[in-house]
Design a protein with these regions (language model features):
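Internal alpha-helical scaffold of NAD(P)-dependent oxidoreductase catalytic cores
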Residues: 6, 99, 121-136, 140-141, ...
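NAD(P)+-binding Rossmann beta1-loop-alpha1 motif at the extreme N-terminus of oxidoreductases
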Residues: 3-66
Length: 282
């Protein structure tokens, strides 16, 4: 049994679940390609925003969503007591399970940020293998939606070879998204949180170096620019602390996996120290 993804767009129905920053951009991208899309979110404000950008088939009522060929999970995942809170993904998979039929296998793609092992767990425990399941972590950046929007180089992993092929057919062939195929779905799951943890550490280094430079009576920007003349060095700017929700959250996803986290936990401490340092300078 294979997912129904036809050459003609009218053959395929897609459902985007979670219409926040990433889900809304994804849904708009799909609608602009004239594909049959349904959007779902528990928030009335999110539903209203979707309507304002031209997504007309959108609802807060899961029962209104028809059976679909593709389900894209774009729900927010956060932290609870400093550990990953993935309950929204589990709840969404339970909703999708109700929509699955024995005769066909829909494609389910988890775009939300998760930890290694989650996809195979929901594949076994919730779907009982009755779907094609892939993980395609988003790299969406709202400040540059053209270059870093839905259609940019992304990573894909599947729970099995059939799932991977279904995912490739949809993302690469239908949506036109360039893909790097990970060696396993666990590698794809690790990819997003590792990328953001790496970025966090880079910024924390710049923050610490700025404090060191000023302690020594040096101008940090002058030192940074001098260092960056070397071909393999690119020290980032140190601004107002590491903000947003993705980087601070995702580095904690990584540190929650293991005790081998001294560098990353140190980066978290540096950012706290840097914020306090900035406050005391005013």
């Amino acid at each position: 049994m294979q997912v129904t993804i036809c050459e003609e767009s009218v053959c395929m129905r897609i459902c985007v679940i979670g219409l926040g920053e990433v889900g809304l951009a994804t849904a708009k991208y799909i609608v602009d390609k004239k594909l049959d899309l349904w959007g779902y979110d528990i928030s009335s404000a999110a539903v209203e925003r979707a309507r304002k950008v031209g997504i007309l088939k959108v609802t807060q009522n899961w029962d209104d969503v028809p059976l679909s060929d593709v389900y894209l999970i774009c729900v927010y995942t956060g932290l609870k007591d400093e550990v990953p809170d993935l309950s929204a993904v589990f709840d969404t998979c339970e909703k999708i399970k109700v929509k699955t039929r024995q005769s066909t296998k829909p494609l389910v793609s988890v775009e939300s940020t998760i930890v290694p092992g989650l996809c195979k767990r929901v594949f076994r425990e919730i779907f009982d293998g009755r779907v094609h399941l892939v993980h395609v972590p988003h790299r969406y950046w709202a400040e540059e939606p053209v270059d870093h929007g839905v259609k940019q180089s992304r990573v894909i992993g599947g729970v099995d070879s059939e799932s991977l092929q279904a995912g490739l057919k949809f993302y690469r062939d239908v949506l036109g998204v360039p893909l790097y195929v990970a060696s396993s779905i666990e590698v794809a799951e690790m990819c997003k949180i590792a990328e953001n943890a790496y970025r966090y550490v880079q910024i924390a280094f710049a923050e610490e170096l700025r404090m060191v430079c000023e302690e020594c009576g040096l101008n940090f920007d002058d030192a940074r620019k001098a260092c960056n003349t070397k071909w393999n060095i690119e020290i980032l700017e140190a601004r107002d602390g590491i903000s947003g929700h993705c980087l601070p959250k995702d580095i904690r996803y990584v540190t929650s996996l293991t005790t081998f986290n001294i560098l990353m936990k140190g980066a978290l401490t540096v950012d706290e120290q840097y914020r306090e340092w900035l406050k005391n300078r005013k």
